């Protein structure tokens, strides 16, 4: 690997460790020319499926968009960032586990709702109201009654 300090192409690995719950390898490297040390992270590049929207259009997986939607539902709620990241991680794992090239937006939405139900019930109702396009108060009531039965 090229040294970021002197651009020399020969470096050696001093230390390797697993990071991010085993999803990455963290490597400490040293340049054979200038002696500077730096850290690299190695991640397997796995293609996530495309998302098929309700209108039939297809979009590449966009974790930022999903995170933004979840955070909007969780706005001003007492949920730790780590819990949100863990939920996103589980959704990503489920996407990979399908083995499919495409996943419907409705399936993805159901997974998000499952995660939000566990994180925060208010956020779950918020997300469900947008995702399922609630028209009136009775739709809210049905979702809330469903939560109370659990």
Curated annotation (Swiss-Prot):
It comes from Alkalilimnicola ehrlichii (strain ATCC BAA-1101 / DSM 17681 / MLHE-1). It comes from the Bacteria. Belongs to the NrdR family. This is Transcriptional repressor NrdR. Residues 49-139 form the ATP-cone domain. Binds 1 zinc ion. PANTHER family: TRANSCRIPTIONAL REPRESSOR NRDR. The keyword Membrane does not apply. One of its GO terms (biological process) is negative regulation of DNA-templated transcription. One of its GO terms (molecular function) is ATP binding. Negatively regulates transcription of bacterial ribonucleotide reductase nrd genes and operons by binding to NrdR-boxes. InterPro entries: ATP-cone_dom, NrdR-like_N, RNR_NrdR-like. The lineage of its organism: Bacteria, Pseudomonadati, Pseudomonadota, Gammaproteobacteria, Chromatiales. A zinc finger (unnamed) spans 3-34. Its cofactor is Zn(2+). Keywords: ATP-binding, DNA-binding, Metal-binding, Nucleotide-binding, Repressor, Transcription, Transcription regulation, Zinc, Zinc-finger. The keyword Transcription applies.
């Amino acid at each position: 690997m090229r040294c970021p300090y002197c651009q020399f192409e020969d470096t050696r690995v001093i230390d390797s460790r697993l990071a991010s719950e085993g999803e990455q390898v963290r490597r400490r490297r040293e340049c054979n020319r200038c002696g500077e040390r730096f850290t690299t992270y190695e991640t397997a590049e796995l293609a996530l499926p495309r998302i098929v929207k309700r209108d039939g259009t297809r979009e590449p997986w966009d974790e930022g968009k999903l995170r933004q939607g979840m955070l909007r539902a969780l706005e001003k709620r007492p949920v730790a960032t780590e819990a949100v990241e863990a939920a996103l991680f589980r959704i990503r794992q489920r996407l990979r586990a399908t083995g499919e090239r495409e996943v419907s937006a409705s399936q993805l939405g159901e997974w998000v709702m499952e995660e939000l139900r566990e994180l925060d019930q208010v956020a779950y109702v918020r997300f469900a109201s947008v995702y399922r396009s609630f028209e009136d108060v009775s739709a809210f009531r049905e979702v809330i009654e469903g939560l109370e039965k659990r």
